[in-house]
Amino acid sequence: MSHSINGHFTPASLLKFAAPSIIMMMFMSLYTIIDGIFISRFVGSNALSSLNIVYPIINIVFAIGTMLGTGGNAIISRYMGEGKNKEAKECMTQFVVISLLISVVILVLTHMNLTSISRILGASDLLLADCDSYLSVVVSFAPAAILQCLFQSYFVTAGRPNLGLVLTMIAGILNAVLDYVFIVVCQMGISGAALATGIGQSIPAIAGLLFFTFSKGSLHFTHFRLHLRELGQACYNGSSEMISQLSNAIVTFLFNIVMMRLAGEQGVAAITILLYGQFLFNAFYLGFSIGIGPIVGFQYGAGNKKELKNIHRIAFLFVGISSVLLTIAAVTLSTPIVSVFTHDADTFRLAAPGFKIFAINFLLSGLNITSSGFFTALSNGLISAMISFCRTLVFIVLSLLILPTFLDLTGAWIAIPVAEFLTLLLSTVMHVRYFFRPGKQNYFI
């Protein structure tokens, strides 16, 4: 494994190394997006709205998994870079066990308060039954969902990124097939979509458990003593990614409330479609950050400042160029993209023009995600969390509270682009301070 992340990286080799994580994250995002397509087309726009109403609970599960996945991975890869393989294995095992315990608690509490949670999240009388149906099934697979988040990071550090890629692709394809079987053939409605998602998530979760149990490589499960300091560091390092997921829950909730007020159930369906676009786009850059994270952590632990600077340069050059290209594609193809999700005329009328405005944020979000991820890999959880917290919560909430008041629907569409722009200013200041200004805080010196 050390040879795969310890050498000199060119743009091609860095992208090749990160590609499995990128594809994995995009396939993971497709679980929910495929559900949305089948639900909207074969169940209805109200069912699509219901999925988005309860999605904050799913965000909480992903938040825990992402925190201990990316944050824990920074600890594991650093230990391996320092030659401390025993500590790396013990920490990984501990993170998996604790994540499983947390997911079981979430599962039990949600089932005990199902209808109350749906109501709190904004379900109207028209949407309540579908909200309860989807949430009750999908939260039952919380342990699988949280393990999948962890293993997508740990496979990379174990030197087996392609295994994670293959498993995620199989799970994504199975999810799509089961969506068709459960929703179209068996007429199970929104519950069928949740069941398909859960089964899909179980594939990489079970395979990951088997791999790290029987692996003879440098990273596998082992007996462990509690590493409370490392657990705290993992939570700290991964706090930005956790904040991002928790903020998604809060922002989704606020968007649902705002859109229900401005345009009713069709408004919620429209913003769901736009958020799906953002979900897939952000998954691309989150996967890239996860993919290069072990390299950054290893080079930092090994004290190789020259290669660290090289990786930084390549990463942001790639993100900048690809963001421009993907934004142009999103704006140009906005109408066919929206039409994939809905045939409902009212929903399409709201979503199609909104997507063109909303897509502006794609130009900026990749840079911000990569900035936060880079600081996470360097074990600078404070800066990473600050960027993520402002990007995914503070700036968006302020935009949502202010802009729709004066601009109605247009204010809702531009809330995230405005937040991304403000975050880019903050990220730029942090990068100048920690990467380009001479001094003890400079990671390149």
Residue ranges and their predicted role:
Residues 1-18, 76-141, 185-239, 296-361, ...:
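Short alpha-helical transmembrane segments in multi-pass integral membrane proteins
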Residues 21-74, 138-145, 232, 236-298, ...:
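Transmembrane helix-bundle signature of multi-pass secondary active exporters and lipid flippases
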Residues 28, 32, 36, 40, ...:
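Juxtamembrane/transmembrane-helix interface segments of polytopic membrane transporters
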Residues 30-33, 42-45, 79-82, 157-158, ...:
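Helix-loop interface residues and adjacent transmembrane-helix termini in multi-pass membrane transporters
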Residues 35, 72, 113-114, 151, ...:
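Hydrophobic/aromatic residues in alpha-helical transmembrane segments
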Residues 48-108, 145-163, 270-334, 365-387:
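Small-residue-rich hydrophobic transmembrane alpha-helices
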Residues 60-63, 175-180, 205-209, 279-283, ...:
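Hydrophobic transmembrane alpha-helices of multi-pass small-molecule transporters
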Residues 69, 137-156, 167-175, 193-206, ...:
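Short runs within selected transmembrane alpha-helices of multi-pass transporters and secretion channels
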